[in-house]
A protein has these predicted regions:
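A conserved ligand/cofactor-binding region detector
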Residues: 1-793
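Short hydrophobic/aromatic residue motifs in ordered secondary structure
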Residues: 615, 801-804
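Conserved small/polar residues in nucleotide/adenosyl-binding loops
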Residues: 794-801
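Hydrophobic alpha-helical segments, chiefly the membrane-spanning helices
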Residues: 805-811
């Protein structure tokens, strides 16, 4: 990189846009101009990559979420210019640390969106023609504040200072039609820079805009709200991720969102293909579309509709093309997450598409009759039935391939939730265990550990081939290396402690065990179990039954969906437990409970590097995969978890002896749950009863609800004893696993006393994390589902002098 030229361009941009200099610019101004300078640097490579992708068979990844995280640091890393840019800024009294408070792009919520981001990163790094399609949310999910222990949601206006990593592509805007309105979908393109290559992928995000911004006739008549109604109604479609669907209006808006980006993406794909080839007959030869969960499944009938209604194909030919093009990733076995839409609602919102959904269903029925299936079988599997459109079933019927995201998850799908479909189309089912990008989740977020690994291996090849970490196993008994690793971990714990103090105003002791659970708040992820276990340990310390407890800081980070009452009650419960144990003189030096606010990618980057213990405690058989477990493993935490999701493969790779597995397994739960009565545990185990009683005896405040009403903690209690919603009592086996979980927690606590032996366990987890790179996952998709190959034409040395595997220093 020519530093003088880079600085000149940066200075010019600051002067032109803001009338300021590098020395005087506000952080957001510096970020804006630095981004613009980098965008100029990659411009020719990005354009060449677009052309190369269009010349190749390419994959299009449709996802409701893309949780990209902060772009600036990752892009500098991938370009290999982090140190040079930081040195340049420091020469003028600034540094890259000045950009620490730049907002994350609020384009997702949890693992689904982060997985999509990792996939784009891996594809770009390995020259694979993969591009993403999603929604450019104005406010994302929400910004979380904890007020008096309660989650409060605020609008997350992440673009208030601009969005310098996006380009608005006005010429590519398309029209999306609903039953009651027509809107524009305007694309904003974000570059996905490949590490150590010239390849730059594209994430195309659609923003909803009104066809008519302002109705002057309405304004002239004094109807001022009516004058901007069309504009507001259109913009609402892309304002918020996952609008609350507890009401009819919320359901309509969510369906409109799903159709909005699915329709716009299909239109864009067809338009580009036609421009290149002049025909859609060969669409399946050049395009493959991956549906990330059920949200974009409406793209299936939409593609068929466009082929028939706008390009004159007959239905059967359009169906054949759709079958060649689409593939579907299933992310859950939970019935409530396998989307179903009321037929009445679908017909109302997208009447033209609904017609083709019915045609798909009719074809399915004919196919099944041809296979001599009976009515009961057909009714059970039909994409439309019981007044509902079953999105997962429609995806499975039309797609070429269906995949689960961890070995145990795929096995459960085949034997349980999708057993009939697997028996019908066994050749379509595959497993693709999820992965994470080591570039963001090690090279970027943990430069000290990265430097140690690179020193020991003699090179940084691991940044693009994580299997190289296996060579670290030989150092597992090297006391000097383990001491270096422990020093790195200590530095990261100090860094996190400083950030938590600044961000949340809470003091935490870096000399304690950092036991961390960070993930979306949901009952199946069992933050509730973790909270109850802390109470169990607290009372055990108080009564002397638990002795010699190693001081531990229990850290939670999670957001609850705004309308999810019990999840929000769990957040409040964690806060109340925190108040209790943190203030008690008997325990305050042994236990600290912290709930960090507004957990996001940037916060996660600090948490995963500092963790000693990774909490992965979902009920066996409910977590499809999980990726937080992989990030924490890669940074040297042991897994305390159930035999669920990717935990299974983590212990297979790193050894169960180097992790802590507890609780009932899938096959055991299949036998236990039909006759399970949690009250038997409650009334036979005094220690568990003591903990549960605190939810209803007034010891913990759930917000001062009058005694004649049912408070939120009592609702949590009754969910365990009597059941809640459509669930049986203790549906997620919290009480059933509690004793086993506490004992596993205490085993971790005792083992930590031998620091060197514990460090060895952590080190062996790092050394065996190679399988969990998203590079491996994406290559598997490319070879076995998408049938795409690297665009090797554009991997020659770059004119922008990118230095291969140039890692930032750990200073």
């Amino acid at each position: 990189m020519n530093k003088e030229l880079f600085y000149s361009e940066l200075s010019k941009d600051l002067k032109k846009k803001f009338g300021t200099s590098v020395e005087k610019a506000l952080p957001w101004q510096l970020h804006e101009s630095l981004s613009a300078t980098v965008m100029e640097l990659i411009d020719s490579d990005w354009e060449n990559s677009r052309k190369a992708h269009l010349d190749s068979r390419r994959a299009c990844y449709l996802s409701m979420e893309f949780l990209m995280g902060r772009a600036v640091y990752n892009n500098l890393l991938c370009l290999g210019i982090t140190d040079e840019v930081d040195e340049l800024l420091k020469a003028h009294g600034r540094s890259l640390n000045d950009l620490e408070e730049i907002e994350d792009a609020a384009l997702g919520n949890g693992g689904l969106g982060r997985l999509a981001a990792c996939f784009l990163d891996s594809a770009a790094a390995h020259d694979l023609p993969l591009d993403g399609y999603g929604i450019r949310y104005k406010y994302g999910l929400f910004k979380q504040k904890i007020v008096d222990g309660f989650q409060k949601e605020e609008a997350d206006n992440w673009t208030k200072y601009g969005d310098p990593w996006s380009k608005r592509c006005e010429n590519d805007k398309v029209v999306v039609k609903y039953g009651d309105q027509t809107v524009y979908a305007v694309p904003y393109d974000m570059p996905v820079i490949g590490f150590g290559t010239k390849n730059v992928g594209t994430l195309r995000l659609w923003q909803a805009e009104s066809v008519e911004d302002f109705d002057f006739a309405q304004f002239d008549c004094g109807n001022y709200d009516g004058a901007v109604k069309a504009k507001n109604d259109a913009e609402n479609i892309s304002k918020v991720l996952y609008p609350n669907d507890n009401c009819e209006e919320g359901k309509i808006l969510r369906l409109k969102q799903e159709y909005f980006f699915s329709s716009a993406s299909v239109t864009d794909i067809l338009k580009k293909h036609l421009a290149k080839f002049g025909t859609l007959d060969n669409l399946g030869d050049y395009i493959t579309i991956q549906l990330n969960d059920t949200h974009p499944v409406i793209a299936v009938p939409e593609l068929i509709r466009q082929l028939c209604a706008e390009h004159s194909y007959d239905f059967d030919k359009a169906f054949e093309i759709a079958h060649k093009v689409f593939n579907y990733t299933n992310h859950t076995i939970m019935a409530e997450a396998l989307e179903k839409w009321d037929c009445r609602l679908v017909e109302k919102v997208v009447p033209e598409v609904y017609t083709y959904i019915l045609m798909i269903n009719e074809r399915f029925i004919k196919d099944m009759y041809a296979l001599k299936k009976d009515r009961e079988y057909i009714s059970k599997l039909s994409p439309v039935g019981d007044g509902m459109v079953k999105m997962a079933f429609m995806a499975i019927y039309v797609s070429s391939y269906i995949n689960g995201v961890a070995a145990i998850h795929t096995d459960i799908l085949k034997k349980g939730a999708l057993k009939d479909w697997y028996e019908l189309y066994p050749e379509r089912f595959q497993n693709k265990t999820n992965g994470i990008t080591q570039r963001r989740w090690l090279a970027l977020c943990n430069p000290e550990l990265s430097a140690l690994i690179t020193k020991l291996l003699g090179n940084a090849d691991w940044v693009k081939n994580l299997d190289e970490l296996k060579k670290l196993e030989k150092y597992a008994d090297d006391e000097a290396v383990l001491n270096e690793f422990m020093a790195v971990k200590e530095a990261q714990k100090n860094r996190l402690a400083a950030f938590v103090k600044e961000h949340d105003g809470v003091d935490i002791d870096p000399n304690t065990i950092f036991d961390i659970q960070i993930k979306r708040l949901h009952e199946y992820k069992r933050q509730f179990l973790n909270a109850l276990s802390i109470l169990y340990i607290y009372y055990g310390i108080k009564d002397g039954s638990i002795k010699d407890f190693t001081p531990t800081t229990f850290i939670f980070g999670a957001k609850s969906a705004p309308g999810y009452r019990r999840a929000k009650a769990i957040i409040k419960l964690i806060g109340e437990i925190s108040k209790l144990v943190n203030a008690d003189p008997d325990t305050k030096d042994l236990i600290k409970v912290v709930f960090v606010q507004n957990y996001n990618v940037s916060y996660a980057e600090k948490l995963v590097t500092a963790a000693d213990v990774s909490e992965q405690i979902s009920t066996a058989g409910t977590e499809a995969s999980g990726t937080g477990n992989m990030k924490l493993m890669l940074n040297g935490a042991v897994t305390l978890g159930t035999y669920d999701g990717a935990n299974v493969e983590i212990v297979q790779e790193a050894g169960e002896e180097n992790n802590y597995i507890f609780g009932a397994r899938v096959e055991e739960l299949a036998e236990i749950m039909p006759k399970y009565d949690p009250r038997e545990i409650l009334f036979s185990n005094d220690k568990i009863k003591r903990v549960l009683d605190k939810l209803i005896d007034g010891s913990l405040s759930d917000g001062g609800v009058p005694s004649n009403e049912e408070g939120s903690f009592k609702e949590l209690y009754k969910a365990l004893t009597d059941g809640a919603s459509w669930h049986v009592p203790d549906h997620y086996y919290v009480l059933g696993d509690l004793e086993s979980y506490v004992q596993a927690k205490l085993k971790v606590n005792a083992d930590y006393k031998d620091k060197l032996a514990f460090a060895k366990k952590c080190w062996l987890n790092i050394a065996n994390a190679g399988k969990f790179s998203s590079d491996r996952t994406i290559k598997d998709y490319a070879e076995n589902i998408w049938k795409i190959e690297p665009c090797l034409l554009y991997t020659s040395p770059s004119p922008r002098d990118r230095q291969k595997y140039r890692m930032p220093s750990s200073a």
